[in-house]
Design a protein with these regions (language model features):
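Alpha-solenoid helical repeat scaffolds
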Residues: 30, 59, 73, 91, ...
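Non-catalytic interaction/regulatory modules that flank or connect domains
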Residues: 184, 192-248, 253-259, 263, ...
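Hydrophobic residues within the alpha-helices of tandem HEAT/HEAT-like
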Residues: 34-40, 74-83, 104, 116-128, ...
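Short inter-helical turns and helix N-cap capping residues of alpha-solenoid HEAT/ARM repeat scaffolds
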Residues: 23-24, 66-68, 108-109, 178, ...
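Alpha-helical scaffold repeats of the Armadillo/HEAT/TPR superfamily
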Residues: 8-12, 49-59, 92-101, 134-161, ...
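Intrinsically disordered, low-complexity regulatory regions
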Residues: 1-15, 23, 28-42, 266, ...
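Acidic, Ser/Thr- and Gly/Pro-rich intrinsically disordered linkers and low-complexity segments
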Residues: 14-16, 153-179, 261-293, 336, ...
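Elongated alpha-helical scaffolds that mediate protein-protein interactions in large eukaryotic proteins
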Residues: 2-59, 63, 67, 71-73, ...
Length: 462
């Protein structure tokens, strides 16, 4: 439980914050360094944000453009504050932090891009932050929207053109560490995909392709932060049924999700008919995605695509079932196993009912401010997918689960990735499945112990 600060503590903290505006740079540096340590504690964050006379967020925003050592400390402290409390995100927007940071990263001499991206990822976990990044604020004009779109596109191009470089192994978790200053762009894209305008931005066609199409290869990135963010963004796109045809027909999202879920298990020739050869071409050398958040997002994408009749037909045609059947047999995570059950049930049964009200689904899915702190390992999107910055180390974000927002703490290495919205309850529509296909599925289902005779099951993608 968070304790209220004593009068002496409040006075001491206010004096510390006041030093951020002192004319002597060495005093500003000392104050900013101390604030990094303080903001690593949730209790201190609460007390700092509750100061009656001084606004710590405003004071830190002012020195973001200070000399590099001071600016670095300020950004790290803001990462911690915005990861811990949405109020800090709101205040940061009030003091024009987004424009300050976006201007800095455009400077080729700027050397704090990784921290800047982490801070942007945290601030955009809130709907207000995502809207402001896209330029949809109260003062939006066609010109400002076009300019902001250009800036985000520039960041995305830098993300796509850069390659993560190995940087050893995290002693605490044993996970690989990466020198990848644009990795948190994946979190940012996952965060904006919670909004209709953000999804439109990702789907907008440019030079015969969309941005999300260009992002698909990142699902194979060795950096889990990138994989989590892109997987979370794809899940958010799958919540709009209007996008489904483009996602499964033009981008072949089902095959890309199958690639994540496929393992070394052999497949019968009959199972391979209709399946993209890339899924089984590696044979017993194929490795299944090891990150839980990415696997969950992959299953959720397939489940959401199953909420339309044509989507179910496409998944059957591409032979999704054999892949998820094998994945289920070795899946250690109970939540993912439950989602596979629901997916299998959709693929094998005759369904009755009407299509869901997707407007209602979107309202429920994206209205809640559910924020999920990512696991301590890869740190990002969930998923899509806020950060706290560590003093001595480079922060490693945590990836968002597909449904919550992304936060990161640099010190704790926690990153929140906007998780996509909660999954809709879906009533399946009338549909005919061949007797042979249904019989084959039913036999295999007995091994999974999945019930397929309930007509009114809800589909929840949590």
């Amino acid at each position: 439980m968070t304790e209220q600060a004593t009068a002496a503590q409040i006075k001491s903290m206010e004096e510390l914050v006041s030093f951020l505006s002192h004319p002597r740079p060495e005093l500003r540096k000392s104050a900013s360094s101390l604030l990094i340590s303080m903001t690593a504690s949730d209790q201190s964050v609460f007390q700092l944000l509750a100061l009656p006379k001084l606004d710590v967020v405003q004071a830190l925003c002012r020195v973001v453009s200070d000399m590099r050592p001071i600016a670095e400390d300020a950004i790290k402290a803001l990462i911690n504050l915005t990861a811990a409390n949405p109020t800090a995100c709101e205040r940061a927007l009030k003091y024009d932090l987004l424009n300050r940071v976006m201007t800095q990263v455009e400077d080729s001499e700027w050397r704090l891009t990784d921290y800047s991206m982490m801070l942007l990822a945290n601030v955009t976990t809130t709907p207000e932050g995502a809207k402001e990044l896209l330029g949809y604020d109260a003062k939006a004009t066609d010109a400002t929207l076009a300019l902001r779109e250009k800036k985000i596109r520039t960041l995305t191009n830098a993300f796509l053109e850069s390659e993560p470089e190995p940087e050893g192994v995290d002693a605490a978790t044993g996970d690989a560490k990466w020198d990848d200053e644009y990795q948190y762009v994946a979190n940012i894209l996952a965060n904006i995909s919670q909004l209709e305008q953000g999804r439109a931005f990702l789907l907008k066609m440019r030079q015969n392709t969309s941005l999300v199409g260009a992002l698909m290869p990142q699902l194979k990135s060795p950096n889990v932060v990138r994989r989590r963010g892109v997987a979370a963004a794809l899940k958010n796109l799958c919540f709009d049924s209007d996008n489904h045809f483009y996602l499964y027909d033009q981008l072949d999202v089902p095959t890309n999700m199958m690639l994540l879920l496929a393992g070394p298990e052999p497949l019968d020739e009959e199972d391979k008919l209709g399946m993209n050869p890339v899924v089984f071409s590696q044979g017993d050398k194929k490795k299944r995605e090891q990150d839980r958040q990415v696997r969950l997002a992959a299953v959720d994408c397939l489940l959401l695509l199953c909420t339309t009749r044509n989507g179910r037909k496409d998944l059957r045609r591409k032979k999704v079932y054999p892949i998820i059947r094998n994945a289920h047999l070795v899946e250690p995570d109970e939540e993912i196993g439950d989602q596979i059950y629901k997916l299998v049930d959709f693929l094998i049964r005759d369904e009755e009912g009407e299509e869901p009200d997707w407007n209602d689904i979107r309202a429920k899915s994206f209205a809640s401010d559910q924020e999920t702190k990512t696991g301590e390992d890869g740190e990002v999107v969930k998923p899509p997918p806020q950060s706290k910055a560590p003093e001595p180390k480079k922060p490693e974000p945590k990836a968002p689960e597909a449904k919550k927002q992304v936060e990161t703490r640099v010190e704790d290495k926690k990153v929140k990735v906007p998780a996509s919205s909660t999954s809709p309850a879906v009533v399946a529509e009338d549909e005919n499945v061949s007797d042979d296909f249904a019989g084959q599925m039913a036999n295999e289902m007995s091994a999974l112990d999945v019930s397929s005779d309930e007509e009114d099951d809800d589909v929840d993608v949590d």
